[in-house]
Amino acid sequence: MKKWLYIIPLILIIIIWQASQIYLGSMSYQKKEENKAIAFAKENVKELSSITDAKYYHGRLAYTILYGTNEKDEELIIWVPNSKKGRLIVKKASEGWSKEKVKKYIIANQNPLKLIDIRLGAEVIKDNRTNKTETTPLWEITYIDQEKRYTYYFMKFTDGSFVKRYSLKKDRFEEEN
């Protein structure tokens, strides 16, 4: 019986240690990607004077979204692709919809039960009229809709126009009371 008093805490310590190693490993990978994106942006975006924040987006392609300013102290948003398949996109924040404007639009027009997340991203979008594809900066909005489905709504960063929406079955994400 005394063996179990030593074995159980030892097993718990090993589990906690391994879980922390996995977590730290994944966070160091994300930090490494962020540092690569910052270095790439500093090298390729001449008007960039400072970087204030970095976020990660993973759609069809992964992007690191950098927030910064130029020499004129105008806010910049830089979409840095995490692979060679994507393309670098640089926009002034004033060229597109703000997060607050997106939030107001979604609440007014989609009437979500719960707004979960609003984040910038980029997707390759095909124009059916011209048959051309283009990497487009967009907003990804995640919310619970009126039918209690987990919903992703995508709209263009520049003008707020609808890109796509998809919802996951409600029984997969229903909260238990």
Where are these regions (language model features)?
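Long, terminal "pre-/pro-" and other extracytoplasmic accessory regions
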Residues: 1-177
